[in-house]
Regions:
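Hydrophobic face of amphipathic alpha-helices that form TPR/SEL1-like repeat modules
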Residues: 1-28, 465
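N-terminal alpha-helical segment of soluble enzymes
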Residues: 28-95, 295, 307
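Conserved C-terminal structural/oligomerization subdomain of aldehyde/semialdehyde dehydrogenase
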Residues: 29-34, 258, 312, 339, ...
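Short, well-ordered beta-strand elements within core beta-sheets of diverse protein domains
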Residues: 33-39, 54-60, 149-150, 257-260, ...
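N-terminal Rossmann NAD(P)-binding subdomain characteristic of aldehyde/semialdehyde dehydrogenases
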Residues: 59, 70-162, 199, 475
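Rossmann-like NAD(P) dinucleotide-binding subdomain of oxidoreductase/dehydrogenase enzymes
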Residues: 126-267, 389
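A short hydrophobic/small-residue beta-strand
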Residues: 174-176, 349, 429
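ALDH superfamily catalytic-core signature
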Residues: 233-369, 392, 432
């Protein structure tokens, strides 16, 4: 693969001349693999101006045409599937096993968005339920919000862009995309694909930059909705800075999975091993806390340890690797420090936890205290903690004792146990006989507490990215 370039795309032009540069580093090898050209404040001002001008043009494009363009983009991505999988692995350090899956999911997300473009329906509401409106009638229509600002993270750099651009374009909005700096080459390549698919030149502005660029975009009154996926601290800043504009926030998690005494231990251990360490644990729904009934504690722990130690840690570009590396060495050092803190507080390190550059071997901690960061904060790294319980309600209480509430999992063969846990767990989603880390892209995805506001999934995001306009006929037809 040739040297990577990450470029802003503003007003129909790719910008690189006279811009501040940053090296793109392969996190696994530490080698420079390309250059990122950062947008200036003046570039961002132009992006805002062009998006503001383009929103009426976008709203005027028919639903059929928007659907057709999204379908074509999905087809092009299918043709370039392996190229994008390797690009994500190269820039992020995510194994090909995972990146191939991410590209497949991205194709589905675009296709689902194309379908939703044709479902922007309103309703007719009779007035005769009121004594004042016996002849009156109201009709509702879905109209675009205007300019959608999409701010995306590094951990799923293609699919989470699709989750914002797909619904936003399907609804007829102009879009400004600000991807994570760590994976801006993936975003650049994807915008090129959208243009190849026929997206109007000024429908989409791509801004390469960091926190300052994001702040300028969020606070400007010309953006009508901010769709942000990232950490809770960043989401809180955005919510406080956005004023009265709409915000759609998919934030952090502290994924808890309960393994009850009647669970299938082999199934539970296999899924916890797979979903606790996928993408080096860099997922907001990654399994982090595993509450295990004391009756099966020993058996589950040994089975999980065996499964985890079978995972292959290695080159992300190798099809044999199950785990690559973290996004950078700084992130790996933080996770290493959290593991060491848990050990000092009394936890037993059963396996893994050794760092080499940006890579950390999958770590299993036994019974860390609830005050340890690996329990009470979002680890966002390859670490799971096993915590014993005696009564189901005790496990539910501990799982709920978190500032986050994204997803949870429950393993049990009793329907009443499953339904009780699903009702009582304070999360946006509960997976039965699965872990917290399971999502299909058309489902309503999001959390409560510090895990976010609103729901993603094309059908549900479109609800956020449109307004309901009412037309009233006081005297009927």
């Amino acid at each position: 693969m040739s040297e990577l370039k990450a470029l802003s795309y503003i007003n129909g032009e790719w910008l690189d001349a006279n811009h501040v540069k940053e090296d793109i580093i392969n996190p696994y090898s530490g080698e420079m693999i390309g250059t990122s050209y950062l947008a200036s404040s003046e570039d961002i001002e132009q992006a805002l101006s062009i998006a503001q001008q383009a929103k009426k043009q976008l709203a005027a494009i028919s639903a059929l045409e928007r659907s057709t363009l999204l379908t074509k983009a999905a087809a092009l991505l299918e043709e370039q599937k392996e190229h994008f999988a390797k690009l994500i692995s190269l820039e992020l350090g995510k194994p090909l096993k995972n990146t191939r899956d991410e590209v497949s999911r991205s194709i589905e997300t675009l296709a689902q968005s194309a379908e939703e473009a044709n479902r922007l329906i309103g309703e007719t509401i009779p007035g005769n339920v009121s004594s004042r409106g016996q002849r009156a009638m109201a009709m509702t229509f879905k109209v675009p919000v205007g300019v959608v600002l999409a701010i995306t993270p590094f951990n799923a750099p293609l699919n989470l862009i699709c989750h914002k651009i797909g619904p936003a374009f399907a609804a007829g909005n102009a879009i400004i995309l600000k991807p994570a700096p760590q994976t801006s080459a993936v975003a650049t390549a994807f915008v090129k694909l959208l243009l190849e698919a026929g997206f109007p030149e000024k429908s989409l502005q791509l801004v390469i930059g960091g926190v300052d660029a994001g702040r300028q975009l969020v606070t400007d009154e010309r953006t009508n909705l901010v769709s942000f996926t990232g950490g809770a601290v960043g989401g809180e800043h955005i919510s406080n800075s956005a004023g009265l504009k709409k915000v759609l926030l998919e934030l952090g998690g502290n994924g808890a999975t309960i393994v009850h005494h009647d669970a299938d231990i082999e199934q539970a251990a296999s899924l916890c091993a797979k979903t606790g360490f996928s993408n080096s644990g860099q997922s907001c729904i990654s399994v982090q806390r595993i509450y295990v009934h004391k009756q099966i504690m020993s058996s589950f722990t040994e089975t999980l340890k065996q499964k985890v130690e079978q995972l292959v840690v290695g080159d992300p570009l190798s099809s044999e690797s199950d785990i690559g590396c973290m996004v950078d060495e700084q992130a790996a050092k933080r996770v290493e420090a959290w593991i060491q803190e848990a050990e000092k507080m009394g936890a037993e390190l059963l396996s893994g936890g050794q760092r080499n550059g940006a890579s950390i071997t999958p770590a299993i901690l036994l019974n860390p205290p609830k005050q340890a960061k690996v329990v009470c904060e979002e680890v966002f790294g390859p670490v799971v903690s096993i915590l014993p319980y005696e009564e189901l309600d005790e496990a539910i209480k501990e799982a709920n004792d978190s500032r986050y509430g994204l997803q949870a999992g429950v393993f049990t063969n009793q329907l009443d146990v499953a339904l009780h846990a699903a009702k009582e767990l304070e999360t946006g989603g509960v997976v039965i006989n699965g872990t917290s880390n399971f999502r299909l892209d058309h489902w309503p995805y999001g959390g409560i507490k510090r895990s976010g506001i609103g729901r993603e999934g094309p059908r549900f995001a479109i609800e956020e990215m449109t307004e309901t306009k009412m037309v009233v006929l006081p005297n009927g037809l």
